[in-house]
Amino acid sequence: ILGVPDLVKSISGLMITTPVLTRPMVENIRVACQEMGFPRNRCFLQDYEESFYYHTLYQKPEIWSRNVGLFIFDQDAVSYAKLEMNRSSRPVRVGVRRGEHTTLHTEALQRDVDFCQFVMESLENEVYSSIYLVGDGFEREWAEKSVAELCKHQRRVFYGNNLFSKGACYAAKEKTEERNLKGYLYVGN
């Protein structure tokens, strides 16, 4: 950043993602972007659900050919969300449906049992092509039964903590440079 003569001109778009967008937050961020010199059409805001959408649709189509699930960990708490597509509409309407949330036991064996049960209840008998696990609180060491349940039916399972930031980058790229998702419309809250 220090060696760039005109930082604002060299950035094609600035994307900010946050768990939830509120009107005061949006107004404050827009003012901050304006103060930094960014025109309104190059400063973007989205919540984590929209970042999940962009991250998912920028993957190979086989990753999202069926349902896509998301488990969000926050220490002992875990919540579930699902990417839903109405493939019969044009453009294809895509949204995120929030599911249940639960608190997991702190002891490893019981934690695995709790999460495995939550996975079964959340996924029900639907067909998923992929599942994402994000946040702090998931560890492969305790999740023996859970991982086996998640990986059933040839589901692809991914875990890490960069899904929302990568989704924000893909969204900025889509809005400023590419138009890969022309046939899709994100429908948020």
Place the predicted regions along the sequence by residue:
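A short acidic (Asp/Glu
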Residues: 24-31, 55-57, 78-83, 139-146
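Short glycine-rich, Thr/Ser-proximal phosphate-binding strand/loop in the N-terminal lobe
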Residues: 82-113
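Nucleotide/phosphate-binding catalytic cleft detector across ATP-hydrolyzing
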Residues: 1-68, 89, 99, 152-153
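Repeat-based blade/solenoid architectures
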Residues: 162-167
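Acidic, glycine/GT-rich loop-and beta-edge segments that sit at the periphery of enzyme/chaperone cores
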Residues: 170-189
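Glycine-rich phosphate-binding loops at beta-strand->alpha-helix junctions
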Residues: 14-25, 121-148, 156, 160
